[in-house]
Regions:
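Acidic, two-metal ion nucleic-acid-processing modules in DNA metabolism proteins
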Residues: 133, 138, 270-313, 317-365, ...
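Short, small-residue-enriched loops and turns at beta-alpha junctions
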Residues: 121, 146-151, 199-201, 218, ...
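Hydrophobic helix-and-loop "lid/oligomerization" segment in the mid-to-C-terminal part
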Residues: 2-3, 8, 13, 19-23, ...
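Short alpha-helices
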Residues: 127, 205-259, 630
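Histidine/acidic-residue-rich, glycine-tolerant segments that coordinate divalent metal ions
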Residues: 172-225
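Short amphipathic alpha-helical segments and helix-helix/interface helices
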Residues: 158, 182-183, 667
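Terminal, basic amphipathic appendages of nucleotide-handling enzymes
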Residues: 1-48, 52-56, 66, 70-80, ...
Length: 710
């Protein structure tokens, strides 16, 4: 298992006090202004309200300061959350795009909006299609099939569009890499407008207009728009109105696309998503209304987290498992009964996606169990016959979470061609790694954190070897980035009101994460199963205060902690309504034994490097090399109780954090000579002593020989 350190951000206490006063003062003035009293407040009233506001806003001010926002004016502007949306005409080629589209409308030419099969592509397609239709355009829309067509505009699609007599194609959320396709369209006399947000190649497609904020020569100030965001700007430009006026018409779709595509929720995106989520809550689109009803959000506030975990997966599932057209039909649907049917169909498809994903994760885990040496690879490459290509990217993400290593999952079809999807970890450029093996591949693409590839099955062993050779040269020791904690808290000082104030920082997402709090020296007072044991709920007590916190994905029987253990917890905090009124609740991100520090992550990484055969410096070897007595201490500790074999942090805490590397080496050595084994009980592995006849020689352990330089 990979462990990551926790990094508690440095806090400027003076800045926190200044921010607390500034925020509280503004809140107090607003309360006085909106009060029902006809008389001005007395000084005593004002001061009492100010004092109460300071108590409620101190936590919020602490988060702002921890994230480097120490100027009161900047903080108040951020909390207002209404940054101006810039003029869409600042996007390079936007004028050309508008001119050609308006010409097509005037001449009654048929326009085809060509999108993508993910949430961003579906919402961008619906957004532009409906707007053009409202302008009186003759317009159609088209989405590619993930399996049949692959990503982006294809020559077959262009030929089909041409054969149907359409004269203009407008891409959304794709097209920036369609160099050959653009030339093919031109050869047929079909005009092309590209609107995209992906990073361009050195050469742009030859089109009437190429609108992409990430063009090297783009003149717009904000580069973080998604495909739906660019389509939103195009609609505003076509109407000739400020983009703020468009929010009431299509802000909901732009917000869903932005959140689902994991775009930074800063700058213009923050304004767009805040407004779009408000509109989504009261949308009059039958399709979105039905989807909200289906996921239990009808009539409730909708958050970015709701979009990420409830709405987006259902829309995405259509493109992964079936056809994205089903999702597009739902978004565009105007009949309530039909919308309800389509929304339920998306739920069914999503359940199928989850089941398929779980099957492949299980198959991948069985493969790792059969070949444990794969876990020593710097880059884990797994493949299987006819694994569903629509979910292998999600499976790769799940395995990255579990292993802390870059993972590529490949599905091999009946013709012996493999389609792979990979996910990386911070600090490892997966695209560069794959590019170093280009001669083994049919196709590849992506970026540092995610990539895709096509490869012949017979080349997979060589690909595994070559990628790991590259990783050994470029990243000999792969450290897991730390978990960033915003604030350390005392439960007795945290109130429902202070946590509720944190909503002013929302929407949360990329580059604006949900605040992470460090709860130190908390006692585990209760462990309860949730959802038939899929998750667990903990009662944590710190001093005289306690909180219930859910740990999603942690089965109670897999929890390596027991009642009475003292832990440090990394938590998100929220407020929920109960029969007793508003209550605080937590969501566990990670637990550590109380006081455990950076040495665990650092020394674990060194031992993993040693297992992979990476040469270590003498000082590094000395840090993790146990003497015989230390190995015996570990063995004797295993005699005292059944220790968890997959999360060793409690054992590290018991034997001493600075002994982490030596403890890991000792466990490996004991296992290699057959004195201990990791045995599964109820889906959880524990260390057990192995009965042996005769003595075992620890010096025979390969890991100890490696440390000795043999």
């Amino acid at each position: 298992m990979t462990y990551r350190a926790w990094n508690l951000k440095t806090l400027d206490r003076a800045a926190v006090r200044e921010l607390t006063h500034a925020i509280a003062e503004q809140n107090t003035e607003e309360l006085e202004y909106h009060s029902q009293s006809e008389e001005p407040w007395t000084e005593a009233q004002y001061n009492a309200t100010l004092a109460a506001q300071q108590k409620e806003t101190a936590l919020l001010a602490g988060i702002l300061a921890a994230r480097g926002i120490t100027d009161p004016t900047e903080a108040l502007t951020l909390l207002a959350g209404e940054e101006e949306l810039t003029d869409p005409m600042l996007l390079t080629d936007m004028d050309k795009a508008c001119a050609r589209i308006l010409q097509a409308i005037d001449n009654e030419e048929t326009i085809v909006v060509f999108g993508d099969y993910d949430v961003d592509g579906v919402t961008a397609t619906a957004l532009l299609y409906q707007h053009l239709k409202g302008m009186g355009a003759k317009v159609k829309c088209m989405l590619p099939s993930r399996e049949g067509d692959g990503y982006g505009l294809s020559k077959n699609a262009i030929q089909s569009i041409h054969d149907k007599g359409c004269q203009l194609i407008v891409t959304v959320d794709n097209g920036i890499a369609a160099i050959e396709e653009a030339e093919f369209a031109a050869s047929l006399g079909v005009d092309l407008i590209v609107t995209d947000h992906h990073l361009p190649h050195e050469v742009l497609p030859k089109a009437v207009a190429v609108v992409d904020p990430r063009r090297a020569d783009d003149t717009s100030p904000f580069k973080g728009l998604c495909g739906a965001g660019v389509a939103f700007k195009l609609c505003a430009a076509l109407d000739g109105c400020p983009p703020e006026e468009m929010l009431d018409y299509c802000g909901d779709l732009a917000a869903v696309g932005t959140v689902a595509d994991v775009m930074p929720l800063t700058g213009e995106n923050r304004t767009l998503v805040k407004a779009g989520l408000r509109q989504l809550q009261q949308t009059d689109r039958p399709g979105l209304m039905a989807l909200l009803e289906e996921v239990g959000l009808a009539g409730k506030p909708v958050t970015a987290e709701n979009v990420s975990y409830a709405i987006a997966p259902r829309i995405n599932a259509a493109g992964r498992m079936d056809s994205a057209v089903t999702a597009l039909q739902l978004v565009l649907c105007e009949d309530e009964d039909r919308a309800a049917e389509l929304a339920h169909r998306l739920t069914e498809i999503n359940v199928s996606r989850q089941e398929t994903e779980q099957e492949i994760v299980k198959a991948a885990q069985e493969l790792l169990d059969r070949e444990p040496g794969l876990l020593e690879d710097r880059v884990i490459l797994l493949w299987g016959q006819n694994w569903h290509p629509g979910v292998i990217g999600i499976v790769a993400s799940r395995l990255v979470e579990k292993t802390g290593r870059p993972v590529i999952v490949v599905s091999i079809d009946e013709n012996g061609e493999g389609k792979g999807s990979g996910r990386s970890v911070q600090g490892f450029n997966l695209h560069e790694c794959i590019a170093s093996c280009a001669d083994l591949l049919l196709r590849f693409g992506g970026h540092a954190m995610a990539a895709g590839l096509s490869v012949r099955a017979e080349n997979l062993p060589a690909l595994r070897r070559r990628m790991n050779d590259w990783a050994a040269r470029e990243c000999p020791v792969l450290y897991t980035p730390p978990l960033e904690c915003d604030l350390s808290i005392r439960l007795d000082r945290v109130t429902v009101e202070s946590v509720a104030r944190l909503d002013q920082l929302a929407p949360y997402g990329a580059e604006n994460p949900t605040p992470v709090f460090l709860l130190e020296k908390a006692v585990v007072e209760g462990i309860y199963p949730v959802s038939e044991g899929k998750h667990c709920r903990l009662r944590l007590r710190q001093g005289n205060a306690s909180i219930y916190a859910v740990w999603f994905g942690m089965h109670p029987e897999q929890l390596p902690y027991a009642m009475g253990d003292v832990v440090d917890a990394a938590l998100n905090l929220s407020v929920y309504e109960s029969a007793r009124g508003p209550q605080l609740s937590g969501r566990v991100i990670e637990l550590h034994p109380a006081g455990l520090g950076h040495a665990v992550a650092e020394q674990t990484a060194l031992v993993q490097a040693l297992r992979r055969g990476t040469p270590l410096q003498d000082e590094q070897k000395k840090l993790i090399a146990p003497v015989r007595g230390e190995i015996i201490t570990v063995y004797r500790e295993l005699q005292t109780r059944r220790w968890h074999a997959e999360d060793l942090q409690p054992l590290f805490a018991k034997l001493g954090e600075q002994q982490t590397g030596k403890t890991l080496v000792a466990l490996t050595a004991l296992e290699q000579v057959g004195l201990i084994a990791a045995v599964e009980h109820g889906g959880v592995k524990f260390w057990e002593l192995v009965p042996t006849a005769g003595k075992k020689n620890l010096a025979d352990a390969p890991i100890l020989k490696c440390l000795e330089g043999e």
